[in-house]
């Protein structure tokens, strides 16, 4: 009986080790359609490959948080997570847009600027 209990405990400990693999997020910022000044569009921030799942993602306009929607948290085959944050916006020649990500694997928030040409 004792060897069985030890084996079960060892198995549980090895499973708990899955949570210990911390992975930093990859961040991509892009618009749904090619950018045209004055034409409504959608701004997307796709964050992937991160673990653990606790994360904070904000879309920013000139450094200020925008109202945005977030997809449900999903995971890949490798058990890393991904999310999409998106909002409607109308690009112009002046405003700057970016995505700010806060995650336990990052020393400071990661900010990725939207490049309207890509």
UniProtKB/Swiss-Prot annotation:
Domain (Ig-like C1-type) ranges: 25-112
Oligomer status and interactors: Heterodimer of an alpha chain and a beta chain. Beta-2-microglobulin is the beta-chain of major histocompatibility complex class I molecules.
Record-level Gene Ontology MF annotations: MHC class II protein complex binding; peptide antigen binding
Main location class: secreted
SUPFAM superfamilies for the chain: Immunoglobulin
Name of encoding gene: B2M
Keywords, ordered alphabetically: Disulfide bond, Immunity, Immunoglobulin domain, MHC I, Secreted, Signal
Signal sequence range: 1-20
Function according to Swiss-Prot or TrEMBL: Component of the class I major histocompatibility complex (MHC). Involved in the presentation of peptide antigens to the immune system.
GO CC terms in record: extracellular region; late endosome membrane; lysosomal membrane; MHC class I protein complex; MHC class II protein complex
Name of the protein described by the UniProt record: Beta-2-microglobulin
GO biological process: antigen processing and presentation of exogenous peptide antigen via MHC class II; antigen processing and presentation of peptide antigen via MHC class I; immune response; peptide antigen assembly with MHC class II protein complex; positive regulation of immune response; positive regulation of T cell activation
């Amino acid at each position: 009986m004792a060897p069985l209990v030890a084996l079960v405990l060892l198995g549980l400990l090895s499973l708990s080790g899955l949570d210990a693999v911390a992975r930093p997020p990859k961040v991509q910022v892009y618009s749904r359609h090619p950018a045209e000044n004055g034409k409504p569009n959608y701004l997307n921030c796709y964050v992937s490959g991160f673990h653990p799942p606790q994360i904070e993602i904000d879309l920013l306009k000139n450094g200020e948080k925008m109202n945005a929607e977030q997809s449900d948290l999903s995971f890949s085959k490798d058990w890393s997570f991904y999310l999409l944050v998106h909002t409607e916006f109308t690009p112009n020649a002046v405003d700057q847009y970016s995505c700010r990500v806060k995650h336990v694997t990052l020393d400071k928030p990661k900010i990725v600027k939207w490049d309207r040409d890509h």
